[in-house]
Amino acid sequence: MANEGHRPDRLTLWQRSTLRRMRKASRKREGEPLTSEDWSTYYRLMSSRSSRFWMGLLRSLPSSPRCGICGAPFAGFGSRLVKPLGYRPSRKNPTLCDTCIEASPPGGMTTEVGVLFADLRGFTRLSEQSDPEAVSALLRRFYACAERVLFPEAIIDKLIGDEVMALYLPMYGKLEDPATTMLEQSRELLARVGYGSAEGPFVEVGIGLDYGEAFVGNVGERSLYDFTAIGDVVNVASRLQGEAKGGEIVASGGLVERLMAPVGERVEVSLKGKAAPVLAYRVS
């Protein structure tokens, strides 16, 4: 359990070093509130060469699922190696590990972020008509496809029943062209599910994409952190996903304008909570 300051009781040497360097750079004592500038420093250090090397080692270990940030395995042989170091699923956010969720200070910063929502179509009907174990196996298969395609460029923020939410954060230094990466990975995810194959998809999936500014960081009290993004860009991506048919990607105009050339069919869609129609592109 973390103490009342901003430094948890148990961190890896790498994370202790990152926090120490961040506080030195921002001239902040332990326990002092952090500003957006401090968070910017923290993320820059988290994406340093040494940090990327360490995360590369974690990702090379076998077994899935993994932490959505650092890639530490949560199952199999790989998890037995890293669990003593604190790399186990966090009770606050089980898609992230204890060390990542505890290492980040409370609060966050406003920054650019890409948001992806992928949702299973007809899941309620499928749940009513199928055996619960079969439904669970289908969900695990879908989650595994999402993890293989989206990681490590994206942080898998949430697995919400029949839905995946992923964040693309340029501030982590992994993405040179986040809009292109988001579109390419969305297409690859649909291909992994089976669209375009002779057998067809094993489940119907629709995807919504948006890109813009949002508040990103640890939201909530220390006893119940949730590393996530909050803002209109999240709401729009979620609503666009609701507009997507099975096998279709609906991307916002804000994301498509960052691409080298427009893609798909230009449309205007009416979204809940929006006074005016929103420009979007349907990509099949």
PLM features: what roles do these ranges have?
Residues G206, D210, V216-Q241:
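Catalytic-core segments of nucleotide cyclases and related cyclic-nucleotide turnover enzymes
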Residues S48-I160:
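Juxtacatalytic helix/coil linker segments
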Residues E243-S284:
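Cytosolic regulatory/linker segments at or just downstream of nucleotide-handling modules
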Residues A2-G68:
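A broadly conserved sequence feature marking short terminus-proximal activation segments
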Residues D131-A137, L159-V203, L209, A229-D232, ...:
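Short helix/loop segment flanking the catalytic signature motif in cyclic-nucleotide metabolism enzymes
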Residues D177, Y225-T228, I249, A261:
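Catalytic cores and conserved motifs of cyclic dinucleotide signaling enzymes
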Residues R7-P8, Q15-R20, T228, E248-E257:
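Flexible, glycine/charge-rich interdomain/linker segments that couple
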Residues A103, L189-R192, G196, R222, ...:
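Conserved, well-folded catalytic cores of nucleic-acid-processing
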